[in-house]
Amino acid sequence: MGTIRIRTGVRSAASAAIAAAVGVATLAACGGSDGSAPSGDGGSDGAKSKTVTLVSHDSFNASPAVLKEFTKETGYTVKVLKSGDAGEALNKEILTKGSPQGDVFFGVDNTLLSRALDNGLFTPYEAKGLDRVDASARLDKEKHRVTPVDTGDICINYDKKYFTDKKLAPPQSFDDLIKPQYKNLLVTENAATSSPGLGFLLGTVARYGEDGWQDYWKKLKANGVQVVDGWEQAYNESFSGSAGGEKAKGDRPLVVSYASSPPVEVLYAKPQPQQAPTGVATGTCFRQTEFAGLLDGAKNEAGGKALLDFLISEKFQADMPLNMFVNPVVKGVALPELFTKFGATVDRPETVAPDRIAANREQWIQSWSALVVK
């Protein structure tokens, strides 16, 4: 499959908002201001190196305190190397296979997992504590080439004010979106260029099957769905319910985003509202799972294994929601109040097996593009 340009979605906006508070401090905790390793530890040069390099997409964030805790427990300092969006970062690792940029890769999700595995990017390693990870997230449980780290749900978000003002119930299912009362209300991202756009497409494949998803999209197109390149444009420009969309005078009260988007709207509003301005149609969700793996040819294999153990520790898992706006995969890790109060609980998300995605992804995207954006 060709290169997919992917926006990680809600975390892109969150990353910008917390860059000063978290991002700069993270670099300080991980190394020099340019992202280099602290002097004297030799970078990621071999078994004796005390630096372990984590290669990730641009939306990786962790609190400095948690990264310092890892150093305290293991003696290793984390160097974070951000390599673009998820698809771009994966492509770079494929191009440097065998001589990787770092020791651990974080951020490949279930829509692209097969590409990473088929290219032999990872050395198998069963992380300590993997038995505490929800079984549904362990998609490579036989070979342990990757370790599940987080989950998120791609769902329709709606502008509460719009539907209240119109005295119209917001849609709750895929079937609702093709009803005439929701004509010209939805904006989605291009499935060929956007992670949430692809996830939404896969959700319709799961819901309607190989024989029905194209007919569904014909009806959605006839009902006035708008398609834009990426999440940033859809959510922060076209969607009327977001702070950015309100400023840009967006006119679409329905958007493909994440179940964690409403808490983000609350967190960064000044003053914080008592209720989220947006809601989630929980019957339209596709489950996204992100993984990390020990890169084949890693210079600091021992450090990489220690980092994989830490990524599924309770300390790191509890730190993720307010830094990357994702859900922990370790059972029993509590979500922060912001999530439980303003977020949506998705009990039955749509899923597609990674091997099925691998066999059909290119064909699905090509068929979708010809049908919807031609």
Name every feature range the model reports, one short phrase each.
Residues 100-105, 123-160, 175, 185-191:
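A structural signal for short loop-to-beta-strand junctions that line the ligand-binding cleft
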Residues 123-131, 145-147, 175, 253, ...:
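Short beta-strand->loop
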Residues 110-121, 141-169, 197-207, 287-293:
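Periplasmic solute-binding protein
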Residues 25-29:
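C-terminal motif of bacterial Sec signal peptides marking the signal peptidase cleavage site
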Residues 292-351:
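Mature extracytoplasmic/periplasmic domains
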Residues 196, 203-283:
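Ligand-binding pocket segment of bilobal, Venus flytrap-like solute-binding proteins
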